[in-house]
């Protein structure tokens, strides 16, 4: 998505830039929300897959910081587009907001809750969210575009909830019998395919969107397979 949008920016094809950025932001929310829910639900099996000796603490960190996936993707995408547009000075504003919010929230949470490392994780989430939203707003204002609230937020959020419930049920069913590794891999494949199917079924994506969204070709193949 970044590469194709950057190509349109360099060629000064303004009529394509808005569509590319809108589809790119939509793609960020589509995949960011899915992996946020997936990480939150499967925090314990994933933590035990990485290091079983600190599985409980690592699981709490994954659960608390799961939304960082979404904000990191949004921050990266908006940063790259603004950089390609020659708006480096605006990046300083976004990252300045992120650092300031992180320091303030981490300090407050650490003193109030005395949660140790979890206060830093939560502060990082809040700070990154503030920076990502700030850069996203700046980018939309600069390019005079805005995300589609229905196709970019509402429908994916509903699909993520459905996949999250399925992942929760499968985790309770599989984890005690097949272990952490098999549970994590199998649930990732099953829930991701279901998520893509629901997005296609609900017409969340249009023809041009597949060009700018990671995995767009695979999603289009899945749609043709089920005639969606």
Residue ranges and their predicted role:
Residues 1-13, 18-25:
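Helix-loop junctions and terminal segments of transmembrane helices
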Residues 77-86, 136-151:
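Alpha-helical transmembrane segments
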Residues 30, 34, 63, 93-97, ...:
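Hydrophobic residues within alpha-helical transmembrane segments
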Residues 66-96:
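Membrane-interface junctions at transmembrane-helix termini in multi-pass inner-membrane proteins
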Residues 168-228:
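Membrane-proximal transmembrane or re-entrant/amphipathic helices at the cytosolic face
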Residues 1-4, 27-28, 35, 207:
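Small-residue-rich midsections of specific transmembrane alpha-helices
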Residues 56, 86-136, 165, 169-189:
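Membrane-interface helix-loop junctions in multi-pass transport and translocation proteins
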Residues 18-53, 59-73, 103-104, 108:
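Alpha-helical transmembrane segments of multi-pass membrane transport and lipid-handling proteins
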């Amino acid at each position: 998505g970044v590469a194709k949008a950057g190509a349109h920016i360099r060629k000064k094809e303004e009529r394509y830039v808005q569509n590319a950025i809108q589809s790119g932001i939509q793609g960020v929310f589509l995949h960011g929300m899915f992996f946020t829910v997936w990480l939150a639900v499967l925090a314990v099996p994933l933590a035990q897959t990485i290091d079983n000796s600190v599985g409980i603490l690592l699981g709490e960190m994954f659960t608390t910081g799961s939304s960082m996936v979404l904000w990191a993707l949004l921050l990266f995408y908006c940063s790259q587009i603004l950089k390609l547009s020659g708006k480096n000075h605006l990046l300083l504003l976004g990252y300045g907001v992120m650092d300031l919010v992180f320091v303030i929230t981490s300090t407050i949470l650490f003193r109030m809750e005395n949660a140790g490392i979890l206060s830093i994780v939560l502060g990082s989430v809040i700070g990154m969210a503030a920076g990502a939203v700030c850069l996203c707003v700046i980018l939309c204002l600069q390019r005079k575009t805005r995300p589609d609230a229905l196709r970019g937020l509402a429908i994916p959020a509903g699909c993520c909830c459905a996949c999250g419930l399925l992942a929760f049920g499968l985790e309770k069913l599989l984890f005690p019998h097949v272990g952490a590794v098999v549970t994590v891999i199998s649930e990732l494949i099953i829930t991701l395919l279901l998520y893509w199917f629901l997005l296609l079924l609900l017409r969340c994506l249009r023809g041009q969107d597949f060009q700018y969204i990671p995995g767009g070709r695979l999603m289009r193949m899945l749609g043709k397979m089920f005639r969606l």
